[in-house]
């Protein structure tokens, strides 16, 4: 029994794909969803981050238990649209695939949750408790929307949280954090013909980087026991088991130097240079440890010439991989997906859960699970399989009913 036809479900997704929310303008999706919820007498509220960025919260049912369903409304930049086979901000159906920016990451998952909420309400299928939909702004960068909702207490009373990021057949109970660490070196600019009276910031930065590589290598040799196991995820993505050595490396802390800047012209000694790292913290080596790790190296080199800035700081998230929510989704999904394709794993990426759960994480059942192939995220010609999009609506409905009934 459904409220929406297949054609209507696809059109609802098409409507929000057309709303261009490239790292901004989520307010347009909020207004669209507010009108949709009003049509079905579902109470909702828009909470602004700023003039153009906002969240929307909608709720059905009452009392406990409370299941939160979440998805983000922002998408990454479409890049050069001439490189797309189909217009990125117009849903195109072709050979069983729905093309468009955000179809996989993650307007497909978000609209599946919205339809779930409406159909459960319209069909009076909620056995007990509350379902709270949290549609967020700014997940792709700083998680501003999730932080706002957490600060306002929207996660304080939840028992379970489903984040419908594209996971295919994977069900994730935990993930690493994500930190952006920028190290800046300062020196003294002079003409390059007299470098001895200046101070080359690049030299200081290289000294830092060489010591960083040495210390990081030593740390990885000690990093052998992990709470998070990401091996099942990699097996699914590459189609085979990865080696124990690779699994150990991937499940631990990782740090990558991804941006380097220094110098403005060839005949001047640079007075500033910087390195930017993306670090993926884990429970054993958390964000506080990472900050101290960088600062200690800076102190060893020269704290008068080096400084550390952390513009992005998201913590790792853990939960029980055998929780009621995980087992419920696994049981329900097995009726729609081949049993041997379903797996439970930790995730190497980060989600809004980092900002949502905070100190409350041990009390919440977490499942990151949604339609879409994660390898399609951020790609040109991004698409979601039509059957998967439609199928996951039914999975979300059944899993929500079962979880609230049995929790």
Curated annotation (Swiss-Prot):
- What stretch or stretches form a coiled coil here? none
Which residues are noted in the entry as Zn(2+) 2-binding? 105, 140, 378
The record's listing under PANTHER family reads: ACETYLORNITHINE DEACETYLASE, PEPTIDASE M20 DIMERISATION DOMAIN-CONTAINING PROTEIN
Binding sites annotated in the UniProt record for Zn(2+) 1: 72, 105, 165
* The protein's name: Probable succinyl-diaminopimelate desuccinylase
| Catalytic reaction list | N-succinyl-(2S,6S)-2,6-diaminopimelate + H2O = (2S,6S)-2,6-diaminopimelate + succinate
Q: Which cofactor does it need?
A: Zn(2+); Co(2+)
Q: Which biological process, per GO, is one annotated for this protein?
A: lysine biosynthetic process via diaminopimelate
What detail does the entry give on cofactor binding?
Answer: Binds 2 Zn(2+) or Co(2+) ions per subunit.
As recorded in UniProt, its EC number(s) are 3.5.1.18
Q: Which organism is it from?
A: Staphylococcus aureus (strain MSSA476)
The UniProt similarity line reads: Belongs to the peptidase M20A family.
* Keywords for the protein's UniProt record, in alphabetical order: Amino-acid biosynthesis, Cobalt, Diaminopimelate biosynthesis, Hydrolase, Lysine biosynthesis, Metal-binding, Zinc
**Residues annotated as catalytic:** 74, 139
Superkingdom field? Bacteria
Report the enzyme's class at the first EC level: hydrolase
Q: What molecular function terms (GO) are annotated for this protein?
A: metal ion binding; succinyl-diaminopimelate desuccinylase activity
Stored InterPro entries? ArgE/DapE (IPR010182), ArgE/DapE_CS (IPR001261), Bact_exopeptidase_dim_dom (IPR036264), Peptidase_M20 (IPR002933), Peptidase_M20_dimer (IPR011650), Peptidase_M20A (IPR050072)
Pathway(s) this gene product operates in, as recorded in its UniProt entry: Amino-acid biosynthesis; L-lysine biosynthesis via DAP pathway; LL-2,6-diaminopimelate from (S)-tetrahydrodipicolinate (succinylase route): step 3/3
